[in-house]
């Protein structure tokens, strides 16, 4: 702003020098490594001329590259532009993305049909955080309270007005904020509500006619835990009775029958799990060294 510009006027040359040095250490024309998701490889590209990244994909076995989101194109003509979330539907046909173009941290969600680039849905004044339903007939998103805290999870069905969106979950404690995610087994949704040192998780199955989140473990002050499901088991990463965390698991049909999967280790920080088709990856840190 004008005040900052005036106060810092005598450092303008130094600012330019520092900026050029920082810029010189960054590879502006760059592409991320691709990652496979269902039928496509996805990656991100940045250019020296642009201020925002491009999101690209290529069907596996094809040479045709699609740009399904161009940040510079979306930001054109806007004084402020910030992307909240990008989510491609499970059938690869739709892109849901959230944008704040005013700087107030209220995001408008758009749904674009990737094939013809047409916007087919728009929901204003959300907190972003988009998660598609497994059948691609709807998606979930977060809603702010009056203090800009995301404390509601709503479901929007494609083709219906946003006034008919269904409230799936609401956090009553003003200290907590909530988010929604899918599990690695692609059968459940999880809702996590948390503050800095305490968390609580709910889950519901994708085939439920009416989604009713079920509590996993009741919140306890100072206890953090996160939930995932894979290959018939629930997994919890928690610091309950484990200062540096541990991992428990139980069968999907025996939610309370928790057993140690990765026990706590004194002086070792236990990281979470990543599930692949045939492998489980985990990390830990001990003696200031990371291990996978």
Residue map of PLM features:
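Beta-propeller folds
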Residues: 1-292
């Amino acid at each position: 702003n004008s005040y900052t510009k005036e106060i810092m006027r005598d450092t303008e040359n130094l600012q330019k020098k520092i900026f050029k040095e920082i810029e010189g250490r960054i590879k502006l024309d760059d592409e991320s490594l691709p990652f496979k998701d269902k039928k496509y490889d996805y990656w991100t590209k940045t250019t020296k001329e642009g201020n925002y990244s491009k999101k690209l994909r290529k069907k596996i076995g094809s040479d045709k590259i699609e740009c399904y989101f161009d940040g510079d194109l979306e930001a054109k003509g806007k004084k402020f532009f910030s992307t909240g979330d990008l989510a491609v539907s499970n059938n690869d046909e739709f892109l849901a993305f959230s944008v704040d173009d005013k700087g107030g941290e209220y995001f408008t969600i758009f749904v674009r049909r990737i094939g013809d680039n047409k916007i087919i849905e728009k929901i204003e004044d959300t907190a972003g955080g988009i998660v598609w339903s497994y059948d691609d007939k709807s998606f979930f998103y977060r809603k702010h309270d009056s203090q800009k805290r995301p404390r509601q999870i709503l479901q929007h069905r494609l083709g219906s007005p946003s006034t008919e969106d269904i409230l799936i979950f609401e956090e009553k404690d003003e200290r907590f904020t909530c988010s929604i995610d899918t599990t690695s087994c692609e059968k459940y949704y999880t809702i996590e509500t948390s503050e800095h040192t305490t968390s609580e998780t709910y889950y519901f199955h994708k085939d439920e006619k009416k989604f009713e989140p079920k509590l996993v473990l009741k919140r306890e002050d100072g206890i953090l835990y996160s939930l995932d499901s894979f290959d018939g088991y629930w997994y919890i990463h928690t610091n309950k009775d484990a200062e540096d965390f541990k991992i428990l698991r139980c069968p999907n049909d025996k939610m309370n029958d928790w057993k140690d999967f990765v026990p706590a280790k004194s002086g070792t920080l236990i990281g979470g799990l990543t599930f692949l088709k045939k492998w489980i990856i985990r990390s830990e840190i001990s003696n200031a060294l990371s291990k996978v």
